[in-house]
Amino acid sequence: MNVKENPYLKYLRRDRLPHIFCAGCGNGIVLNTFFKGMEMAGVDFDSIAMVSGIGCSSRIPGYVKCDSLHTTHGRPIAFATGLKLANPSLNVVVFTGDGDAAAIGGNHLIHGARKNIDLTVICINNSIYGMTGGQISPTSPEGSFGTTAPYGALEDPFDLSELVRAAGASYVARWTAAHPLQLANSIKKGLKNRGFSFIEAVSQCPTYFGRKNRMRSPVEMMKFMKENSINRRKALKMDPEEVEGKLIIGEFADAPRPELCDRIYGMIEEKSGKIDIIKSAYRDD
């Protein structure tokens, strides 16, 4: 039997395979949608630079055949900001997770959005710390179980997409691993947006979140995400009681505004007239 090869294998470092992800993990689905979105956006793969922090999702760039930075916990957006300011011609993509981005990296997240620097941040939200043993994260639903919450989480979770929208990101969307086509389309829009783009990919972690919350099967978890989701356009017309406990998906912001690199280089050019000298370091000649 002839087996057709995945067309996106050309973007992977095959010598790094097999990957470390657990069976049923959603990270592979999200990476696949990234490649699809990148091709849909017409972005040159050679212009991609990936940045990540610490966590399961942050291991993704190591498998991709592009320049990448594997940085310290919670700091990928800070590193990515420096990279983008130094070389604005790059398409800088951040892969991060709910713990990396919303806990130790929370301030970098909101200030990156506020500054509207041209980064595409893909946050894989599985509502738990997967790499370190199943601890509760800032997005764990109230009442969910984890290593640090044997009697259930007592704290209200962050709504990451609403948080980043309120902080000023010019493009924000949330989908799940069970919505790959929509996710790929939002990644395309994020890559084409000149500004801070935040794409939240709600994903399954069967090893820790699933096992500790009586959803052992990845299929069961994906079915739950699919059936428990409601589009934001529809949710905004419903009473709060009707959407309680639902996963709100869709676009949260699509409002272009001036981008940080453009502002900084514009100011330099206006005040000194030396913008060509500064940018010459990144020219082929």
From Swiss-Prot:
Pfam family, one: TPP_enzyme_C
Keywords: Oxidoreductase
pH-activity note: Optimum pH is 9.
CDD domains registered for this protein in UniProt: TPP_OGFOR
MF terms in GO: 2-oxoglutarate synthase activity; thiamine pyrophosphate binding
Enzyme kind, highest EC tier: oxidoreductase
Catalytic activity: 2 oxidized [2Fe-2S]-[ferredoxin] + 2-oxoglutarate + CoA = succinyl-CoA + 2 reduced [2Fe-2S]-[ferredoxin] + CO2 + H(+)
InterPro entries reported in the protein's UniProt record: 2-oxoacid:Fd_oxidoreductase, THDP-binding, TPP_enzyme_TPP-bd
Keyword Transferase recorded: no
Documented EC number(s): 1.2.7.3
Keyword DNA repair set for record: no
Temperature dependence: Optimum temperature is 70 degrees Celsius.
GO BP terms: organic acid metabolic process; sulfur compound biosynthetic process
Quaternary state and interactors: Heterotetramer of the KorA, KorB, KorC and KorD subunits.
Name of the featured protein: 2-oxoglutarate synthase subunit KorB
Organism: Methanothermobacter marburgensis (strain ATCC BAA-927 / DSM 2133 / JCM 14651 / NBRC 100331 / OCM 82 / Marburg)
Encoding gene (name): korB
